[in-house]
Amino acid sequence: MKKKLFGTDGVRGVANIYPMTTEIAMQLGRAAAHIFKKDHTRRHRIVIGKDTRLSGYMIENALVAGICSMGVDVLLVGPLPTPGIAFITSSMRADAGVVISASHNPYQDNGIKFFSADGFKLPDTTELEIEKLIFGNEIDSLRPVADEVGKAFRMDDAGGRYIVFLKNSFPQDLDLNGLKIVLDCANGAAYKVAPAVLEELGAEVVTLGVKPNGSNINAGCGSLYPESLAKAVKEHGAHLGMALDGDADRVIFVDEQGQEVDGDQIMAICSLDMMKQGKLAHNTLVSTVMSNMGLDIALRNAGGQVVKTAVGDRYVVEEMRRGGYNLGGEQSGHMIFLDYNTTGDGMVSALQLLAIMQRTGKPLSELAGVMTALPQVLINVRVASRQDINIVPEIARTVKAVEEKLADTGRVLIRYSGTEPLLRIMLEGQDEAEITGLAQEIADVIERHLGVRTKEQ
């Protein structure tokens, strides 16, 4: 059955426009609260956290009303990274967690996603169950009487608990003394906790994006804008820079020379180091089809392997749990270290990389050399609808011709974004000029038929 509200990462849209309205938020709260009430012999509670978007306040209030109306209590943790909410949900033995965030999207957008009691994202079956209640006629009859409604409580120490958790993921015999780090928090959920963690471990921290005002989240800052980070690293003579996104579930780095180090390179560094220590489960890394072929080559040369999934960190986690793997992630900077957390965690990922730097004494530029990336070009086409490109003859012919031209020296990957109205065209090959021209050729044809193109660097 096709979902009506949930996408690849919860429910998402422009705030105050369907489906990201207070009415839908309240209905989501009601339906989820009913489903997560496993029995009626105890009080149930759901954790709610958010990022720094202005619309987070109204959505939070609507969710609280819906959840409490079904007889479930709420723990409000305020602005906290998405992985922090997953951690609090599990550690507080809550029945579920809710994140109000649109991750790396601009402030006008917002979203609602759920974690189950164990801190993992919901399976499709549970999301469909929630939607069935929302669009059915049953839920009104399930409401409890007045003396059984839930209460909302503020949890003032959630940030402190998450800081301790993060520090405990860093080796006890190491510290960050002597490291100068430029940290960009994207004016998002990590603006308090991330600097505190690095400073408490001994680093000298230069902060960017730590003054949220409700409308500046991800605005020219964070993991999608490494240029400003690179500039700051050079200006301050830092050893490296790291940038989180709005909900801090992803991270990218800039080395001491100002060169970007993306998720593929971070995974290569960490997985090869874990293999040397015998800590990479089954000598296997899980990544998505968007990852660079250079990552596969690096792992294969070291005696490991890469297992590929569809795009989306939830699919990476599902494969990791299915196969018993402990490291996976995406080129975008989502990385999951299942030994520590249940979802992508930018700070956990950063601390694992920083530990390798401190233990080996090598600069990030040298560590990144373990992987040689093949040239990749990514072009986005904004579309009005998700039409099957294979049924548009001119598009299908163009794509086939490009694939035949690349043959075994590269690949073409075209997919719709799971969170935005974009068709992503990715080409990979040995000659950057050639694949740039070929990607442009495909994009021009798609633009004529389906939408407006914007280029992503």
From Swiss-Prot:
Protein name: Phosphoglucosamine mutase
Catalytic activity: alpha-D-glucosamine 1-phosphate = D-glucosamine 6-phosphate
EC number(s) from the headed UniProt entry: 5.4.2.10
Superkingdom of the source species: Bacteria
PROSITE patterns named in the record: PGM_PMM (PS00710)
Modified residues (Phosphoserine): 103
Organism of origin: Syntrophotalea carbinolica (strain DSM 2380 / NBRC 103641 / GraBd1) (Pelobacter carbinolicus)
Record family assignment: Belongs to the phosphohexose mutase family.
Active-site residues, record numbering mapped to chain: 103
NCBIfam families tied to this protein: glmM (TIGR01455), PRK10887.1 (NF008139)
UniProtKB keywords: Isomerase, Magnesium, Metal-binding, Phosphoprotein
HAMAP family cross-referenced by the UniProt entry: GlmM_B
GO biological-process terms attached to the record: carbohydrate metabolic process; peptidoglycan biosynthetic process; UDP-N-acetylglucosamine biosynthetic process
One GO molecular-function entry: magnesium ion binding
